[in-house]
Amino acid sequence: MIDRIPMSVRGNKKLKEELLRLTRVERLDVVKAIEVAREHGDLKENAEYHAAKERQGMIEARIMDLKDKLGRAEVIDCLQVSCKRVVFGTVVVLLDLDTDEEVTYQLLGPEESEVKAGSISVLSPIGRSMLSKEEGDEVVTKTPGGTREFEVVEIKTGDFA
């Protein structure tokens, strides 16, 4: 069974660019670094060689991870989602009922969420608690810091990740 991964168009493009960079640049660079390190002789105590091999392993693992995620990606155009309810890709304006401050988040996948940039994962506690809510609904979220309460002020389309 393949679990689909919701991903924005921008997030999908970013992962494809990273995969391209890893396969066309970094993979080749690390192979050259291994060759150069081999020329220095004894591989048992060759720190350069071992560091390059370790880097190669990390690059190959990331390539496999990216191929897996891209293969399971369900690409969603955040500018085309419905704004009737909170769903993946929507931009949600919330009123924090404790502080009376407004916060704005875009719900994205775990691979592309960045709280500082205003995007949160649909799998995060607040992301899960917002799903399917409508404007005017109350959102109660249990976080490690305690229970937080918000009101959904506005739901709109956007792509500001």
From Swiss-Prot:
Origin superkingdom: Bacteria
UniProt KW RNA-binding keyword: no
Gene3D superfamilies, alphabetized: Transcription elongation factor, GreA/GreB, C-terminal domain (3.10.50.30), Transcription elongation factor, GreA/GreB, N-terminal domain (1.10.287.180)
GO biological process, one term: DNA-templated transcription elongation
UniProt keyword list: DNA-binding, Transcription, Transcription regulation
Molecular functions (GO terms): DNA binding; RNA polymerase binding
SUPFAM superfamilies: FKBP-like, GreA transcript cleavage protein, N-terminal domain
UniProt-listed InterPro entries: GreA/GreB_C_sf (IPR036953), TF_GreA/GreB_CS (IPR018151), Tscrpt_elong_fac_GreA (IPR006359), Tscrpt_elong_fac_GreA/B (IPR028624), Tscrpt_elong_fac_GreA/B_C (IPR001437), Tscrpt_elong_fac_GreA/B_fam (IPR023459), Tscrpt_elong_fac_GreA/B_N (IPR022691), Tscrpt_elong_fac_GreA/B_N_sf (IPR036805)
Family according to the record: Belongs to the GreA/GreB family.
NCBIfam families: greA, PRK00226.1-2, PRK00226.1-4, PRK00226.1-5
Function: Necessary for efficient RNA polymerase transcription elongation past template-encoded arresting sites. The arresting sites in DNA have the property of trapping a certain fraction of elongating RNA polymerases that pass through, resulting in locked ternary complexes. Cleavage of the nascent transcript by cleavage factors such as GreA or GreB allows the resumption of elongation from the new 3'terminus. GreA releases sequences of 2 to 3 nucleotides.
Protein name, per record: Transcription elongation factor GreA
Species whose genome carries this gene: Desulfotalea psychrophila (strain LSv54 / DSM 12343)
Gene designation per UniProt: greA
